[in-house]
Each structure stands twice: as structure tokens, then as C-alpha cells.
Amino acid sequence: MNSKFFGLVQKGTRSFFPSLNFCYTRNIMSVSASSLVPKDFRAFRIGLVQLANTKDKSENLQLARLKVLEAAKNGSNVIVLPEIFNSPYGTGYFNQYAEPIEESSPSYQALSSMAKDTKTYLFGGSIPERKDGKLYNTAMVFDPSGKLIAVHRKIHLFDIDIPGGVSFRESDSLSPGDAMTMVDTEYGKFGLGICYDIRFPELAMIAARNGCSVMIYPGAFNLSTGPLHWELLARARAVDNEMFVACCAPARDMNADYHSWGHSTVVDPFGKVIATTDEKPSIVYADIDPSVMSTARNSVPIYTQRRFDVYSEVLPALKKEE
């Protein structure tokens, strides 16, 4: 596997913000209306597949295929699967279900075939990955030819302890990724995070400033954090950056060890929920319209009004280089 896939944006703050030279001055930047929307952003339909998985990996892959085919049949150009879609979610399962990211692996083969057969861009949720003696929570992205075009390892691990609620430590079995991931498609550039990554606004902000029009988050919030934060965070990331945000969850199974909130959701650049569902197995569809981004960014022009000269401590590496 070519290492370039593991985070298409390399570490180093300046490379995250290639066009932010204007941030070093006190002048408010003058930007034309058309430049506020990436030129490569095209309309498309997205399908979020909210799967109910089992302890049988082959069964999970077969079900994913059926639902991806269904989503494509209903006009989806971009399809998203949930976090840890090929395995039960839980630290006790990750080692058992882990695979290397290589062409001979079952999940790689299945996802590649799904993308190729449907001629869609497939954001393959995430799977437990084994690499050099470590385990990662890893997402693969395939293009319509079935080619792997991006891999994202979950950067922020889900370590929480809610009094009277859920206690969970992904770091007991997983290692964190160390790079952001952005991927170019024929519909524009996408940013990618996994579940807990959505709580860190810097990722979406960096992606948006680098021309991403959509953030994709496979995620499995639970019954404590889900009702409080799932939609809230999706809307926050969308309105913070005036971009589209799509969050794809597993369906809820109360007989499983981990209970997913479900509610896969798509939010537009105004922070409006344009498609969602409940906790049951389903497919969520949304038509992504670039003109909505244009309207949002011209109506509330935060892109021309940010004052990095005032809050430059948000970017300590840039400040140091100055």
C-alpha cells in the first residue's frame, strides 16, 4: 500500500493552510462571490447506509453490498457506510475482526467490488485495521472504478466516562492516526473524519479552507451522547464552515454490546438538517446542491471576515513561523 493514501494532507500546519497568507494582515480580504465556492463542486446525490451488523463478518459484507446496490439504484453518486460496519463495535472485537488494508483482505475486496459494480464513490465506513502490530479504526474510500483513493485512520480515539452513562476507551486496543485526509472526486473535494473526530472543529475548518465542500463522518454515537450531541455537532461543523456535513451511523441493536444512536444525518451549509432517519436500518438520501453553499457563503460571509490577526493563537505553528 502506497503511504500517500494514509492522510492525503501531510502534517505541518502551513501545508494545512496553503492559501492563508491573507490571515497575516489586519485587512479584510476582498473575495468575489464565485470564489467562495470551489470550482470543482458539482451537484450529486448522497446515500447514507445505516446498517444493522452482526458478529458474522461475511454476513455484514453481504448486507453492505445489498444496501450499496440499493442506494446506487436510487440514484446515489456517493455512498457512505457506518463506522465499524464489518464487525460488532467494541474493544473486545477489534483484534478478532481486524484486517490489513490490502487487496487480498475481505473488506477491501468487498468495498472495491461494490464501488466498481455501482460506479459510485464509496466511503466504506470504517473497519478495524491491523498494521505493524497495531490496530486502527480505519476508513477506505474507493472511486467508481473500484480503485482505493484514500485511507483515513481515526485521529481522536473515543475515551469517555460519563457518570451514570457510558464508559468506553478505544485506546485500550486502538492506536490513533496522525494525518488528516482529503480526497478529490468528480463532484469536488471531500474531507473525512471518523466519529469522535467530529468533536474537534479544527479538522473541518482545515478541510474547508483547503477547498473541501463536504465533510463525511462515519460514526457510532451511543444512547448518552447521541441525543445530546450527534445532530448538534453535525450542524455546528456545517455552519462553522458553511459546508455540507454527512454523518452515517450503524442501526441500533439493543441485543448488541454497544447501542448505537443511529439517526444518520445530512446537514447543509446553513446548518439545516436536509435528511435524517431514526435508529432503524435504513438509507438516507440527500441531493447536494452547490448553490446552497454559494447562498450561505454570500449571505453570511465569514470567509471574508475572519480575523486571524486577532486570534492567531488558534494557529500556534503559523504564529511561530511568523
From Swiss-Prot:
Q: Which residues form the CN hydrolase domain?
A: 44-290
Q: Which keywords are on file for this protein? A: Hydrolase
Superkingdom of origin: Eukaryota
Q: Active site located where?
A: 83, 154, 195
GO terms (BP aspect): asparagine metabolic process; cellular detoxification; glutamine metabolic process; oxaloacetate metabolic process
Q: Which SUPFAM superfamilies match?
A: Carbon-nitrogen hydrolase
Does the keyword section mention Hydrolase? Answer: yes
Molecular function (GO) terms for this protein are: omega-amidase activity
A single GO CC term for this protein reads:
mitochondrion
Name the protein family: Belongs to the carbon-nitrogen hydrolase superfamily. NIT1/NIT2 family.
Q: Which PANTHER family match?
A: NITRILASE-RELATED, OMEGA-AMIDASE NIT2
Question: Under which name does UniProt file this protein?
Answer: Hydrolase C26A3.11
Q: Which organism is it from?
A: Schizosaccharomyces pombe (strain 972 / ATCC 24843) (Fission yeast)
